[in-house]
Amino acid sequence: MLLAVDIGNTSTALGLFSGEELIAHFRIHTDRMRMESEYRVILKNLFALEDLPPPKAALLASVVPPVEREMKRAIERLFGVEARVVEAADTGLEVLIDNPREAGADRLVNAVGALAYPSPTGRYIVVDFGTATTFDLVEAPNRYLGGAIAIGPQTAADALAQRTAKLPRIDLTPPKAAVGKNTLEALRSGLVLGYAALVEGMVRRFKEEAGEALVIATGGFAETLRPLCPCFDVVDEDLTLKGLLRIHLGRG
């Protein structure tokens, strides 16, 4: 029984695996001010709510060190197991960038998760929608080749609302048409359709440089963009958690 934890800048995903089956999945807000005792209460309540058995192991991927520290302590005190934090060496990947230490743990874990999918060319492009959206190029059997970082769609929407006087916050749902007839539809067109165009354009450029690849989308916005991005071959919102499982099982 593995508890896999993906600590992102905005939200934290937790998955409980029995063998290779994901039997429970939770998402909570990432709060840098929460203490270990608070995370312990949250975890205890989540497990009690679903009547879940305690994990026998825990593995964390994190881009937020203060939360990582408190979450690790909470898991270890509540469940009495070691909570390991993934390092680049744990992934089994050959990280072929200028400074391998700069590669985010979540991106490397995504690469491990992607390698579970069969790719006719042995290459993968992973698109992960979060606070930032990342594009990563991976090559079988274990090569991480680099990528790109763009602003996340919700981050862009929030920034626009904060820095303009008359533009409201909106939910990121696809508009009826590209040509908006009111402010809300115009915003949705620019933010959703514009973002889809960004994704399609980046994937096209990656393929022009590296050749054909299996495109895997993950993160909370992936399902919204699925009908707008024909470049997606796979949408897997649990890719990071599955990558953590593969590392735990020694398949990284």
UniProtKB/Swiss-Prot annotation:
Transmembrane segments: none annotated. Pathway: Cofactor biosynthesis; coenzyme A biosynthesis; CoA from (R)-pantothenate: step 1/5. It catalyses: (R)-pantothenate + ATP = (R)-4'-phosphopantothenate + ADP + H(+). It is an enzyme of class 2 (transferase). CDD domains: ASKHA_NBD_PanK-III. A monovalent cation. Ammonium or potassium. The keyword Protease does not apply. Disulfide bonds: none annotated. GO terms for cellular component: cytoplasm. K(+) binds at D128. GO terms for molecular function: ATP binding; metal ion binding; pantothenate kinase activity. Substrate binds at G104, A105, D106, R107, T183. Catalyzes the phosphorylation of pantothenate (Pan), the first step in CoA biosynthesis. Homodimer. This is Type III pantothenate kinase. It comes from Thermus thermophilus (strain ATCC 27634 / DSM 579 / HB8).
